[in-house]
Design a protein with these regions (language model features):
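N-terminal signal peptide
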Residues: 1-17
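Short, well-ordered surface patches within globular domains
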Residues: 16-79
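Mature, structured extracellular domains of secreted fungal proteins
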Residues: 32, 38, 67-71, 81, ...
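Short clusters of hydrophobic/aromatic residues that line enzyme substrate/ligand-binding pockets
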Residues: 47, 82, 127
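A solvent-exposed, acidic/Ser-Thr-rich amphipathic alpha-helical stretch
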Residues: 70-96
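Disulfide-stabilized extracellular recognition modules
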Residues: 86-165
Length: 165
């Protein structure tokens, strides 16, 4: 099941369609909340949701259904964060919170990851990148039963040697 590409079109539909759209809207709100709380903590403007960017992310996660590995897409004009969680119990908040948690390893003074950051902190710096204004994500339960989340950011961050904020 892929989700998160929401649009503000109500063409009626079945009760199941309405429930699915309501869940997708709640997931979008959760993802924006996790991202924007981290951005607020460092004085950066909030992100807005882009259904267009979410469409790209959804298409990409659909293509990964059979091979659930965090491999970057070819859309290099977007910044991109990926996460694979074991099992299907992962919700969008927990997945995105893992990226935000990397902030504990980021040292603004040296603009580097410090300590024993097992996965680095580039996903965190993308979340809080000052010039990034739009977010779109796609999530899927892969054939393996694991959960893959991809979030794309525009404009992309993590370029050059600049600081994120």
């Amino acid at each position: 099941m892929a989700s998160l590409c929401t649009a503000a079109i109500d063409n009626g539909g079945t009760d199941a369609d309405l429930v699915r759209r309501a869940r997708a809207a709640a997931t979008v709100a959760e993802l924006l909340s996790v991202h924007n709380e981290a951005r607020r903590a460092v004085g950066v403007e909030p992100l807005t949701w882009s259904a267009g960017i979410a469409g790209y992310a959804k298409k990409y996660v659909e293509s990964r259904r059979g091979e659930c590995v965090p491999r970057r897409s070819s859309l290099f004009y977007f910044g991109e964060n990926l996460f694979v969680g074991k099992g299907r119990h992962w919700n969008a908040t927990a997945l995105a919170a893992a990226w935000v948690d990397e902030g504990r390893w980021y040292d603004y003074g040296s603009n580097t990851c410090v300590g024993e950051a097992p996965a680095g902190c580039a996903r965190y710096t993308q979340v809080v990148w000052r010039n990034t204004t739009q977010l779109g994500c796609g999530r899927i339960v892969c054939d393996s039963g694991d959960t893959l989340l991809v979030c794309d950011y525009f404009p992309a961050g993590n370029y050059g040697t600049g600081r994120p904020y």
